Amino acid sequence: MASIGRDTQSGIYRGGALGKMPLVPASWDALEAAARATMSADAFAYVAGSAGRERTADANTAAFDAWRIVPRMLRDVGVRDLTVDLFGRSYPSPVIAAPVGVLEVAHPEADLGMARAAAALGIPYVASNQASISLEDTFASTPGAPHWFQLYWSSSDELVESLIARAENAGAEAIVITLDTHMLGWRPRDLDLAYLPFAHGLGIAQYTSDPVFCRLVTERIAAPTQSETPRMNSAVLRTLLDMTRHYPGSFWSNLRSKEPRTAVEVFLEVFSRSSLTWQNLEFVRKRTKLPILLKGIQHPDDAELAVEHGADGIIVSNHGGRQLDRAIGSLDALRAIVEKINSRVPVLFDSGIRSGSDILIALALGASAVLVGRPWVYGLAVGGAAGAEAVLRNLLAELDLNLGLSGNTSITELGAATLSHNAS
């Protein structure tokens, strides 16, 4: 990736001279607008929306505005290096494709498309626990590419154990445990539309492909509860058809089966556990030798507790503002956590990155790498795998150019001296 900046930039301009426009817009606002125009109202609200009045999401992007890059001149920056080392492996850039669920609402290629996009750039793809396609099929579609797996801690420890084992057997190189979704945040955009994709059978492929979950479904059918049978209307019919279409197997067999609806009911019951404590982490630590990263850390003391309880890495994140409204911007939490950890484990960052300059700022503040989510989802919506790859390539190109324009040749040179804090 030594010249990804100039190569990408030149390729776009050469294409323009021949009448070929870019597949995806380079500007964030235009990219979001293009995705909105492509996606259904329900789908766009789910992807773009955040918690409450979306003040945390606003804080995430505003936090970057408090920093300015201080360029240095007359340095030889002809050769630049974006590589980073994480958990014993070298990666060509500091960018990781963050876990995002229910990708089928963005594009039919869903997780397979995103896995191909990440693999084309050597970027680790973190498969979501709420994927539209099983982790086995997703990982098998890009053999040799770096794959990680994100875990939501279910109320069933047996299911948690099964998911971890499946990820390890499928070739995952790390387990990312998301801590901030032990309850679903209050999301007005979704609430106003009365839309939760999981209730329609979307985004539960990791579950319907899991033997433990399938057993729970079978047991539920064999011992039915007193669940209310909804009165049939057009909305109920659409929901039942959604469940049927998205459940594994033949549509016509599923239409006659109780399994699709029961699977949704079981998922909604076992999805998360609000009683988790630090002591629960030992359960996962005993069941895998893979690096374990804890995602959702925002306080230095929690970062310390994460290390004390065996975490191999920390992801400073607030879920892109989707969980708790009026929380601090994730970037505002980064420096104190980096100082607290003092290089004992890698500290990764996400929430609010929209540009290559944002990535550079996060790295200069001490992040070992960054995770990017919404930007590539919008690219996927606009252009499938090629669109997602183009968005990621644009981010890397801007990072590469800005690394050189700031007078640096490698990620390791970035630090406090690279930035100036804008007090206003």
Predicted regions and their residues:
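Glycine-centered helix-coil hinge/cap
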Residues: S40, N342, G383-G384
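An N-cap/entry alpha-helix motif that binds or orients negatively charged groups
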Residues: A2-G88, A194-G203, T208-L276, T412-L414, ...
